[in-house]
From Swiss-Prot:
Name under which the protein is recorded: Laccase 1
Organism per entry: Metarhizium anisopliae
Keywords: Copper, Glycoprotein, Metal-binding, Oxidoreductase, Repeat, Signal
Subcellular location: Cell surface
Family annotation (Gene3D superfamilies): Cupredoxins - blue copper proteins
Plastocyanin-like domain segment(s): 66-108, 159-349, 460-588
Length: 603
């Protein structure tokens, strides 16, 4: 019996608004059978629904709730709803994303405008409140449009996007560990869901082969490589398995329907009803990439959009026909409803790096629910742009020269050297499903459960486990240097979606080769073209390079320590985190309180 079958976890959330009104929300986590794509399996429901309910708060609301608890126990924790923007909640208990424990959060902007001091270190890592006129005026100078976009952003549409499998997380992990092979989640995920709805499509192997991203097989895989009728690459490729590893391989223990044997199911796709008579025809949409592995691309037929927020942080808006987002990211877009009223397909496929898989939803103008679909497609089933113009007008976050989404208002890190630098070498160790953040150390899913680092920050000192911990000083500037494709057996590294809790980071550098510099400042002097300290992006989730030909890559992320606490830094691909790809960063540990408040004492 699954661990969830015996568990009923009740989480209570309270918040007090400006009128001193207290609101209570109770989240009941249960485990039962469902069929979000038309094929039954057990999954997690929250308050009887999947995905979990959207939580909408106002900025600076005081929130009270419970941390993860054992049955029969309780614990109340308190925090402020901040910063405003598009966020999401989920669990890091093993691979519970695979089982459906995730939901959207929207913290609505409130308060009055405040001065934004660019020369103040703390302000550089914060965002302003209040007036967003400067944001919307980059989209339209019309005063009515500016007011309308402000209203649309206050009350957006929510789209929680996930990849979905017929296997539970425990079943999926067991397939890899029993077989001794890396079984990509793409192999077992036949569906893309939007707001918990989707279908299983089986268009045929030849169709899927033709939908491969141009040049992918030629660049990454041996000649003659073909996808299966589920759009999956062969599991035994060296580029997938890495190695050689000193373990026994048992491919016969992989269930027959994992990679091939597509079984179609008709169900339903999500429908987003929009009203062109509201907000001067503007609608805001919040996308949450609650995927476990998939890097998705999204577009709306005949409707370009303005991307104005990434990871809960405003960016200078840019207009696109499609955009790529990785697991763990959140995007907010503004769309002008200026087309012929009708029903338009939203295309949300896997981007094609791990699987050829289509996903769909519908955007329907109010009153047109019964009309036939209309519009011009910008993306194919497999996520390929339908024309050179669409490709030119699409957002790709691969590297510095294709990622132009700088923060609004302008917000840049301190130039020159940081106060602290930490080199982290990422890759696989010992087995195709074991992943490290620091050369050889594997982060267990129950790391320091008995002696939490929040209460015992020195618990790992002088032990092997200290390789899983970084410590920083409060008020310091920190550079995290990530190196991929250098560990033995992992020179053809897959991409990683690196997410830091507790603070956002600027990606100030990205380049090829092995990091062999004494400092970031030295690297900047030798390779200025690989750095950007004037307009770098500011986010909490970043993608590393997909080393197609075995070439090494590095990235440099800079942040300011002003939020003391123990924070997880990890890959947001569930299989990678489950395999050990995480590290604890004890930010500002010198500023932690000496005495733990009584109510937070461990019992």
């Amino acid at each position: 019996m699954s661990r969830f079958a015996r568990l009923l976890l009740i989480v209570a959330l309270f918040f007090t608004n400006a009128w001193a009104k207290t609101v209570k929300e109770t989240l009941r986590i249960t485990w039962k059978e469902g069929a979000p794509n038309g094929q039954a399996r057990e999954l997690i429901y929250t308050n009887g629904q999947f995905p979990s309910p959207t939580l909408v708060w106002d900025e600076d609301d005081d929130i009270e709730g419970q941390r993860p608890i054992q049955p029969g126990n309780k614990f109340v924790y308190r925090f402020k709803a901040s910063p405003p923007g598009n966020h999401w909640y989920h669990s890091h208990e093993k691979m519970s994303l695979v089982d459906g424990l995730y939901g959207a959060i929207h913290i609505r902007l409130t308060g009055t405008p405040r001065r934004f001091h660019m020369n103040d270190a703390k302000s550089q890592a914060r965002r302003p409140k209040g007036d967003r006129t400067g944001l919307w005026s980059q989209i339209s100078q019309d005063k009515d449009d500016i007011k309308a976009m402000e209203n649309a952003a206050y009350d957006p549409e929510y789209l929680v996007v996930s990849d979905w499998s017929q296997y539970t997380s425990e079943e999926y992990w067991k397939i890899s560990t029993d077989s001794g092979l890396l079984v990509l989640y793409a192999y077992v995920a036949p569906s893309i869901l939007v707001n918990g709805k989707g279908e299983v499509y089986c268009p045929g192997q030849k169709f899927l082969q033709a939908e491969l991203a141009p040049g992918l097989v030629e660049d990454a895989f041996p000649p003659g490589t073909e996808v299966s009728d589920k759009g999956c690459f062969p599991a035994d490729l060296d580029q997938v398995q890495g190695g050689p590893w000193n373990i026994t391989k048992r491919p016969d223990l992989i269930p027959p329907r994992v990679r091939e044997g597509c079984v179609a199911s008709r169900h339903e796709n999500a429908t987003i009803v929009v009203d062109p008579s509201k907000n001067n025809g503007w609608v805001s949409m919040h996308f949450v990439a609650a995927a476990t592995t998939a890097q998705i691309t999204f577009s709306v037929d005949s409707h370009e959009f303005w991307l104005y927020e990434i990871d809960g942080n405003y960016v200078n808006p840019r207009k696109f026909a499609s955009a790529v987002m990785s697991a763990g990211e959140t995007f907010s877009v503004m769309i002008k409803l200026d087309q012929e009223p009708g029903k338009y397909t939203m295309r949300i496929p896997n981007s094609g790096a791990s699987q050829v898989l289509g996903g769909f939803a519908e955007m329907v103008y109010k009153g047109c629910e019964r009309e036939e679909k209309a519009g011009k497609a910008y993306l194919s089933y497999g996520g390929n742009p339908t024309s050179p113009d669409v490709e030119k007008n699409s957002f790709f976050p691969w590297q510095l020269d294709t990622d132009h989404m700088s923060p609004w208002p302008p917000n840049k890190p301190r130039p020159g050297n940081a106060d602290e630098e930490h080199l982290l070498v990422l890759g696989r160790v010992g087995a195709p499903y074991n992943y490290t953040m620091n050369t050889k150390y594997l982060y267990p899913v129950d790391f320091q459960n008995d002696d939490p680092l929040l209460f015992y920050p020195s618990a790992t000192r002088d032990t092997e486990n200290d390789g899983l911990v970084l410590r920083t000083k409060n008020g310091s500037w920190v550079d995290l240097i990530l190196q991929v494709s250098t560990l033995p057996g992992d020179t053809a590294s897959s991409e990683h979606f690196m997410h830091k809790h507790g603070s956002k980071t600027w990606r100030i550098g990205f380049g090829t080769g092995v990091w062999n510099y004494t400092s970031v400042e030295e690297a900047i002097q030798e390779r200025p073209q690989d750095f950007n300290l004037e307009t770098p992006g500011l986010r909490d989730t970043w993608i590393t390079a997909f080393s197609i030909g075995g070439e090494a890559y590095w990235s440099v992320f800079r942040y300011f320590v002003d939020n003391p606490g123990p924070w997880l830094f990890h890959c947001h691909i569930e299989l990678h985190l489950m395999g050990g790809m995480g590290i604890a960063i004890l930010d500002g540990v010198d500023a932690w309180p000496e005495h733990i408040p009584e109510e937070y004492q461990l019992r």
